[in-house]
Every structure is written in C-alpha cells, then in structure tokens.
Amino acid sequence: MPRNTALEKYRNIGICAHVDAGKTTTTERILFYTGLSHKIGEVHDGAATMDWMEQEQERGITITSAATTTFWSGMDQQFEKHRINIIDTPGHVDFTIEVERSLRVLDGAVVVFCGSSGVEPQSETVWRQANKYGVPRIVFVNKMDRSGADFERVCAQIKTRLKANVVPVQLNIGAEEDFKGVIDLIRMKAIMWNEEDMGLTYELVDIPADLQDRAEELRMEMIEAAAEASEELMEKYLEGGELSEDEIHQGLRARVLNNEIVLAFCGSAFKNKGVQAVLDGVVRYLPAPNQVPAIKCETEDGEPASRPSSDDAPFAALAFKLATDPFVGNLTFIRVYSGVLKSGDAVYNPVKGKKERVGRIVQMHANKRDEIKEVRAGDIAACIGLKDVTTGDTLCDQEDVVILEKMDFPEPVISVAVEPKSKADQEKMSIALGKLAAEDPSFRVKTDEESGQTIISGMGELHLDIVVDRMRREFKVEANVGNPQVAYRETIRSKVEQEAKFVRQSGGRGQYGHVFVRFEPLDEVDENGEAKVFKFVDEVVGGVVPKEYIGSVAKGIEEQLNNGVLAGYPMIGVKATLYDGSYHDVDSSEMAFKIAGSMALKEGAKKANACILEPIMKVEVVTPEDYLGDVMGDLNRRRGIIEGMDENPSGRVINALVPLAEMFGYATNVRSISQGRASFSMEFKKYAEVPNNIADEIIKSHNS
C-alpha cells in the first residue's frame, strides 16, 4: 500500500506553553479550520476536544498530551495537502514530564505566549527542554485582545529572557479591544478575518497609514534575517536591497530549521484571528520528518547507529506515552522513525527483551479514534494489544535490533502514604496504582516494609492529588492520604565493647546465652558504591561460643538493627565483632544466643553515642537574578548549605544541600518568592546527622 501523503508533507508538531497562555484554545481552532471539529470547543465551557480526561475539563488545565492528526492546504489553498500531527502538551510544572516526553518525539513546535503576561516560568522550562532536544520552533503571541496585550513587548521579552533570536513576520493592527487583524510583513498587506464565519474567510487590504513606517522597519529586519541563510541570498540582497517572496520564505525556513531564528506570529485564538496564518507558518517553516537529523540509536552491542526517516529502512519506533482507554484497554502511543508497521505484525522490545504482537493500530483525534491498517516513517499513532511496554521503550524489527535513546525521567521528590477506605478496595487499589505507574514514569509506588503502608511518590503535590483523583474516578477506589513523610535512620558514632548474658532458670531446662560483642561505625561501600548497612565478624577462639550458635548471635543483632534503639528507625553503618562468651551444655540454645545478641546491641549502641540520620537532598534552583537574595535566604532558613552558583540563560543556578524534612511545601513557596519564575529539582544525596534539638523532638514523638 503506497503512502497517501508524501513524507515531505508531514509535520509533527507540539503546541506548548505556560498554563493559561491559551494553548488548548489554539489547538481547538486548528482543528476547526482544518475541518475536523465543526463546533469549536471552548475551554471555559469545559468542552475542549483535546482535554478529554474529566479532571482536565473540571480544572481547565491540560494534563496528558492528546495526539491528533489533521490536514491543511493553506489559507488560500496555496499548498498541496499537508498532514499535521499535533500533540497538545500540559503547561503545569508538575507535568513537565509530559512535555519532555512529547518534545522528544516531535520535529517542530509552536510555542504559545500570552500577549499580556508574556514569558512566564513554565515557558522558560519548556524553552529549555526544546533547546535540549534541538526542536525548531515558531512563536504565536496569543490573546492580543486582552487588556495590556503588546506584541512587540512580548517579542522583546523572548529575546532577553529566553535568549532567542526572534524575527516577527507579522505586526498587529490595534490591540486589546481594538485588535482587528495582522499585517503580513512578507506580502505587505493587512489581513482582516471575517467575524461572520468565525474567521474561515478573510480580506487582504492596504496597511493602515499609521502603521506603514513600523511595518517597513520590521520588514527590513525580517529580510536581513532571511538573507543570512546563504551567500546567494546575501549577495542578491546586497545588490538590490530586496528579496522575492519565495526567497524570503526559503531563507527564513532554512534558518528556522537550523535553530538560528524563531519566527513570531500574533493573534487571538478565542476571537478566531491569526491561527490560520500560524498553520501556514507550520507548513512553510517547520520541518518534515526527513528534514531533521536522522534519529540516533544504539545496536544491541552498544555501538552508535542512526535510522533515516524512510519507509525502506527497518522498522523502529519509540513508545512515548501509555494511556488506559475504557473501551479498548491499553493504548501505546508510538512515533515511527523508520520503516512500516502493519496491524498484526510482531515487534521486538529490546529494552525488555520481549517479542510482542500489535493487535490494532488507531489514529487518534483527541479521544475519538479511526482504525488504520499500517503506519509508516513519520507517523504518530496508538497501538492496541501491547502488554509489557513502558514509556520510553523502543519497538523495532526483530531482525534488525536498535535501541533509541532512553528517556531520562526525574526522581520523584515527594511521597505520601495511601490506604484504601475499605479493606475490599485493597486489591483494586494495587491494580489501579500499577496501571498509573506504567503510564507515568515520574510516579512510583512501593510498599513500606516497616509499616506495611503503600507509599506513592511523584513530582509535586498537584501531581499526587491528580493520581488520587484518577484512582477515584477511573478505578472507583476511595483512598485516605497521609502527610508527606521522611525516612530517618539511626547509627553509632564510637567504638564500644559490650557484654550481654541471657539466663533463665524456671525448673527443668533453662536458657543460657552469654556473649561479648565489639560495636563500631562501619565505613565500607559495596560494589555499587552504596554504604554498607551491617557487617558481622566472628573472632571467637577455642569454641567458647559453639559454631552452631554464632549465626543466631548475628541474627539477633540484625533484627534489633531493623527496630533501631532510639526512635524505632532502622540502623545503618554498624560493624559487630563477636570475640568472647560462654555456654551451658544443657541450657544453651539458638534462641538464648539470639536474645543475647539483640541485648548486646540495645545496651551497646547507647554507650556508642547512637544518633539519628536524615536524608539530605541535592537541590538545584534556577532563579532570575532579581530574586536571588530571597531564594538564598529561604534556603538558609531551611538549614540548607549553599555549595555553589552558576549562570545560565534563565538566570542564576543555586546548588545546595538541604534536609528533605525542610523541603515540604517548597514548590509552592519558591513560586511565591519568585512570583512563579524560579524552578527547582532535587535528588537524594546522602544521610547525615540530625541536629540535637531536632533529634530530641523525633525521639519524643516516637516515645509518646
């Protein structure tokens, strides 16, 4: 079966932005103008086509990236039909993982900014992620009808804050409630969209006299930017001071594809103005799958390789998202980089080392689906029937195995205990959490061995709220959620020798175990470089403690280690040496020596200066210069130690070590200190001793 659309006419794009820049509305308008969605879904009615999870419609924010396929031939039908695959991405900081995952599989992006609030914190995060994956992008300054909207101010902010080389290809006519249309700087005409038919048709009119001069200045800047694309264009421009429309398009496209410039468009999606021109921009300036560098991968032996975007190359695709669908079960969204996959084909998953069969393939439109027979290089689709696939896995031809880059997922930073409200829900809860964890790699589930509780961990408080919410709605499990927890540990600080004797006489056979144990701090690491928890050494000579009882002594010490000696937290970093003791022919038993061992640790640890340890996190905060002092002051108040500072395009980077116990609520706090412009990440670094006053409180709360 030949291709319906040539690969050059594909565009895989993401629409990304900060919460509330109007990203979902922009996507809705794209679906409307491309003829897919006859009634435009308004976000504030909770009816947007792309926001298909209930929580999204309720909160008016987009949580999961829905993928949609649509077609466009231009505002004047000036292009052949192009196929545009769109991924709508969330803008909330707790869901950065979704954005990262989408950018990984896109060829280009439209970044939406609000005309009045301009560059916001999440836009800085998204921009950083797009830089990381080298994604060419164009900018749409939306909400030009809002009060305070100013297109040129937002372009200037993008230059200074995001260090991007912005080239406007349009200029707005009026702003706020007087926003009427845009000037096309390439054709030097004003575009006025028809309000009667929701902007489906438009008129080209002369540029208003008061904007003529500014339009000409901006046009000169744009032509200079286009001319820098090649020596031929530069020569032509220097000779005649002008370029033809085609040459301008050609020059701008070449520079966008090289990530040298970012073109800026403006409009108001809500008022049906400007989105159509952005669609033309996507076709004109963003790359087709075969115009971006071939995807890098590794062979099974770890040798570097790459896969060209071609149907003739062996099949390779990346599973970039999993979703559970109420009707068909698991959906695995894939981006096909090379080759062809037909429904019913077997694929190999080198990450899991398993072969799987693809049942059906569907093309998604938000959450409606059309079944298709095959997918080819450049396609984005969802497979039904894959059982053991995790986000970030590669699917490939079994005869020609490659592993695409693994996605790096951040470690969760916050944990809470959850328990089902009724015993009957226990199993349902386990199944629900398992499914949610497979869908979202930044969310983890584990059972705490000490308390038997189920602990869930994620990227932030909103992230975990939504997980608990989805358990309730999709899996009908009601759960109670505890407060965020810290995993403390205990250890000893000095060397001590301890005698312990367990003797019981109560008529008949008694109990007798007698040991001398030396306890000292253990500073050894295992083969992974992790600190060792416990080491037991046997130095008994002359059989004063018989061989068969030595294991019992070790076991008694180890059991007591798990229960701690100060506040019930497990002890780590302890070396125990059994060097003497005595036994009784009749009364000694394994049990007696086990109890003697645990008594020795209980008594000895107190003399060996036992103390409490807490997890210390490596925290990195990126903040604009203006808030540096406040952010550092706040870290100091949290018992943080500032290790160093760096510069980066988004501001200053502070590296600090901060106790986890002081980091709860930090996400909300750092946002309010920096008016939402600072972002942070943290990961576990080491255990360190807790200050005495805090240790006293921990022990007190344990004993009460």
Swiss-Prot record:
Q: Where is the tr-type G domain?
A: 8-290
**What keywords were assigned to this record?**
Cytoplasm, Elongation factor, GTP-binding, Nucleotide-binding, Protein biosynthesis
Q: Which GO terms describe its cellular component?
A: cytoplasm
Report residues binding GTP.
Answer: 17-24, 88-92, 142-145
Q: Which GO terms describe its biological process?
A: ribosome disassembly
Source organism: Francisella tularensis subsp. tularensis (strain SCHU S4 / Schu 4)
Q: Which Gene Ontology molecular function entries are recorded, alphabetically?
A: GTP binding; GTPase activity; guanosine tetraphosphate binding; translation elongation factor activity
Name where it's found: Cytoplasm
User: What is the purpose of this protein?
Assistant: Catalyzes the GTP-dependent ribosomal translocation step during translation elongation. During this step, the ribosome changes from the pre-translocational (PRE) to the post-translocational (POST) state as the newly formed A-site-bound peptidyl-tRNA and P-site-bound deacylated tRNA move to the P and E sites, respectively. Catalyzes the coordinated movement of the two tRNA molecules, the mRNA and conformational changes in the ribosome.
Protein name per UniProt: Elongation factor G
**Its family?**
Belongs to the TRAFAC class translation factor GTPase superfamily. Classic translation factor GTPase family. EF-G/EF-2 subfamily.
> What's the chief localization of this chain?
cytoplasm
Q: Which InterPro entries match?
A: EFG_II (IPR041095), EFG_III (IPR009022), EFG_III/V (IPR035647), EFG_IV (IPR047872), EFG_V (IPR035649), EFG_V-like (IPR000640), EFTu-like_2 (IPR004161), G_TR_CS (IPR031157)
Q: Which Pfam families match?
A: EFG_C (PF00679), EFG_III (PF14492), EFG_IV (PF03764), GTP_EFTU (PF00009), GTP_EFTU_D2 (PF03144)
